[in-house]
Amino acid sequence: MRMLRWLILSAFSVAGAVQAQGNQDSAAASAPSASIGAPVLRTSPGLRVHRLPDEKIPAFMEADQISGDPDSEVTLTGNAQVRRVDGIIKGDRINYRRDTGDVDVQGSARMLRDGTLITGPSARLNVDTYSGEIQEPNFWIGASGGTAQARHADIFSKSQMRLSQVTYSGCPCPKPSWYIKADTVDLDFDENEGVARNGVLYFKDVPILASPYLTFPVKKERKSGFLMPTYGTTSNSGFDISLPYYFNLAPNYDLTLVPRYLSKRGAQLGGEFRYLGSGYRGVAIGTYLPDDNETGRDRWMYRTYHRQLLGNGFYTDWDIAGASDDNYFRDISELGLNTASTTYLPRRGRVGWSSTYWQTYAQVYKYQTLQDPDAPLAPPYDKVPELWLKGARYDWGGFDAEWVSTAVRFQRSLLNGRRLGPDGDRLQTYPTVSYPIGRPGWFLVPKVGVHYTQYRTDWYNRDWNRIGLSNYKRTESRTVPIMSLDAGMIFERDASLFGKAATQTLEPRLYYLRVPYRDQSALPVYDTTLADFSFDQAFQENIYTGGWDRIANANQLTAALTTRWLDANTGFERLSLSAAQRIYFQDQEVTLPAEQPRKNVRSDFLVGATAALTDTLITDVAAQYNPYDNKWSRGMVSARWSPQRLTTVAVAYRYQRDPLPGISYQPQGQNQVSLAVQWPIHRRWYGVGRVDYSLRSEPATAAAAEQSPRVTQAIAGLEYKGDCCWVGRVVYQRYAVSAADTNTALFFQLELTGLGALGTDPISLLNRSIPGYQSVVPPTPTGTTFERYE
């Protein structure tokens, strides 16, 4: 019974998921003072807006026949109406006393105000106070889009009324699929609150929920109250139900508390506080589950984000998160959200300043690493602190000048009591100057810079003597000049593509890079890794990414060619083909620890293609081919076909070779095929689904067996579009939470148009997982007070 009451309270308290929005103050620019004797432009008093008292607002009358004294009582007969700027009253016969504002409407009474229309056989009200009563009224509420019928309505003011024996629905269908019946309903439009007594929710004329007392919003605005409950089931947590309560604390901040029950683990309390003001915004979320039934200990997580402008170019922000243990997100993930893959939680605080030419900040950046026992990770280095400075001046006599400097203290957490590397300080500065030359059809960008780095390293010789690091110097420095020349051309011609007029482009590009060799073997590696070779990386100054603890020697030329076919009428890109390769004039001598230096004269060959030959079919191809061993290093092929609304099929294949044994800085190999579908099954039934299948085949070892061919994610669901009023959904999800384990979730949703949705919303999951997914319920345009005019 208590659960039933929770459900009914939430069903009628449709505050919805809202965003905290604040009023942003805008300061008007002050005009310069007029000189003495100069003419001054002033606003005429007659043009200023004056708010008249309600009793002073003029009324205009119209009818087939008008009789009586216009200064006291007037009778309007036949198509009668009394119109004021704030509303209109119509009827077959209207008696109107101008001195008191009383109106008596007989026959086809019709009143319109602020987009809300009320009709009935008769009505009595006062146009000055907007109070009165209506018999057997029908309502079309413009603020919420709902309709209502009642036996009697008492109107107390412009914003307050009471309805007796009410039937309400937010369904726009001629015969609503859902509606609410209540003995009485009090409406307060100023407070955005409706109070219903002895209310019952009917679905398909069957009562499904009841409550003696409930509140709900009467406008499409935020209101404190229960939100719709969410429920489902997962293999890790069991039956999962939550009932959020929303606090509309102020126009610019709010709070949502989420009591949650997980049958396998116990009761949890979560919360989210959001705020927004002039120059600042932020959010704080957290959950707490005492004495987990499965683990016997408290489980919790938190995250807070804040950004604030301090004035004069200064700002501050932070992003701080934490969890009680490594398995929190694998055990207690949100329904429909695959947070189980969360690995690093940030703990960052920053103060910065920016101006026209300079930017700087000081920050502390730490991490909490959530370890997977089946695939342990080395925790990243913390930056405690980091100082960053950038100066830039563009088009300075034709030159672009930049200067970037950083100073960082690196510290690394122990892993199982073991030290994984040295700690230390790093100072870097990198000034560059370029002279871009751009002309119609070609460009040329010469660039030169000098990168200087100084290290002061704590090698912890006692811990590292066994691998010979005790001979490394505490202080080292490195100076590397970097020179590049980037050039390209763009040719165009009229062409055709499969018989359709098109414009074809031919875009060759050359990029030469020269970086002399500097011995860097004695330098530590804090935050640097080998970058994936790609079209973007082929035109970068360094094959390493991150903090540039290594700068590779280079004497190389990258050549690329792109051709496009653009629709001659719209400019839409129908087909694009690209290829690139790097030619080396010098062997690689700078490497990361355990990295094998490159000896090849040519790099892997990059190819890519994007085609939208029809409006319904889009394909993408990207591949990296090794010409020396005649093998593909990386590849991706995808296609999406969407012949009509609510119909899409997407397939993809991704492949990446495994890194060499002992190489930890390259990504793990991948061999995966994916299929995602949204398809109409029969009439109102629609199917949705996705499957990701790993084709990896590993040796029969304990660790490798967990990565053998398996389904890494599976989604299957059905959607039923009942009519314009409701949609039913059931979705099943299975996904990997670690190298060895999976989680299974099943959730249901009943969406009632104009009221809300019971159950967990799977739309965000489907949007992320199914390319081109569309909701079976198209979004309704937001109504205004001008929605209905008479």
Swiss-Prot record:
Compartments where found: Cell outer membrane
GO cellular component: cell outer membrane; transporter complex
Keywords, alphabetical: Cell outer membrane, Membrane, Signal
InterPro entries, alphabetized: LipoPS_assembly_LptD, LptD, LptD_2, LptD_C
GO biological process: Gram-negative-bacterium-type cell outer membrane assembly; lipopolysaccharide transport
Tagged with keyword Membrane: yes
UniProt-listed Pfam families: LptD, LptD_2
Function description: Together with LptE, is involved in the assembly of lipopolysaccharide (LPS) at the surface of the outer membrane.
Protein name: LPS-assembly protein LptD
UniProt source species: Bordetella pertussis (strain Tohama I / ATCC BAA-589 / NCTC 13251)
